[in-house]
Amino acid sequence: MLSYRHSFHAGNHADVLKHTVQSLIIESLKEKDKPFLYLDTHAGAGRYQLGSEHAERTGEYLEGIARIWQQDDLPAELEAYINVVKHFNRSGQLRYYPGSPLIARLLLREQDSLQLTELHPSDYPLLRSEFQKDSRARVEKADGFQQLKAKLPPVSRRGLILIDPPYEMKTDYQAVVSGIAEGYKRFATGIYALWYPVVLRQQIKRMIHDLEATGIRKILQIELAVLPDSDRRGMTASGMIVINPPWKLEQQMNNVLPWLHSKLVPAGTGHATVSWIVPE
């Protein structure tokens, strides 16, 4: 089942949260000269036209990136991420949104590498064309969850693994946990960043319970809700679960989340939280 297209949702509040966390982790990894791997299990098309029929049909970016990218009081924690967005929109008009692979491409250094996977028959060729001239990147049409077995550990023994499946199938909620467990067996020092949507809170509670049962330590949860939990409204919140987070990430997100919530949710509904699922 491959009906999900991220082009309908690019630049929404969930992307803002995901890419804020992604960029902060990458910037942290760059503090050491040693190279690292960026592995993206569900990479998407790479770049999204916000004037496309898909994006215009939902207009989700108007309540996401459009609300923050030109703010004068932008927190320092958002600079790396927003600078990438501005790089793709030099005219000052918000026309393109960079997905996680393009954010990584701009932030990574010459010595770092990218391993990108996408299975969707329409998105894979777009992703491949984005990276055809980038010698640091390897793009594959494959099952993203299998990459957690096949591509780990990296030679450098340093890396960020971003896992953000579409959750089209309910089994994805179990697949992310088993995939992380497999990856962790091979690469216990890697940073794993798992994105999740809150559609039914019970699914997330079950997923977190299963993750706790793996015995993995150092699991940080970051969540941004635009509406209260509901079983009728679709996605009301999204979150990032980070295993082995950089030591600064908790404080950075505590600094920036209240600002993001105030800009993205002017009505003040929902919540913004940073908490440990499992401490060290």
UniProtKB/Swiss-Prot annotation:
Gene3D superfamilies: Vaccinia Virus protein VP39 (3.40.50.150). One of its GO terms (cellular component) is cytosol. Its EC number is 2.1.1.266. This is Ribosomal RNA large subunit methyltransferase J. S-adenosyl-L-methionine binds at H19, H42, S100, E118, D143, G144, D164. It catalyses: adenosine(2030) in 23S rRNA + S-adenosyl-L-methionine = N(6)-methyladenosine(2030) in 23S rRNA + S-adenosyl-L-homocysteine + H(+). Keywords: Methyltransferase, RNA-binding, rRNA processing, S-adenosyl-L-methionine, Transferase. Recombinant protein prefers protein-free 23S rRNA to ribonucleoprotein particles containing only part of the 50S subunit proteins and does not methylate the assembled 50S subunit. Recognizes a minimal substrate corresponding to helix 72; this shows that RlmJ requires only a small hairpin for activity and this suggests that RlmJ can methylate A2030 before the 23S RNA is completely transcribed, processed and folded. Cannot modify single-stranded DNA having the same sequence as H72. It comes from Escherichia coli (strain K12). Changing K18R: 10-fold reduction in catalytic activity.
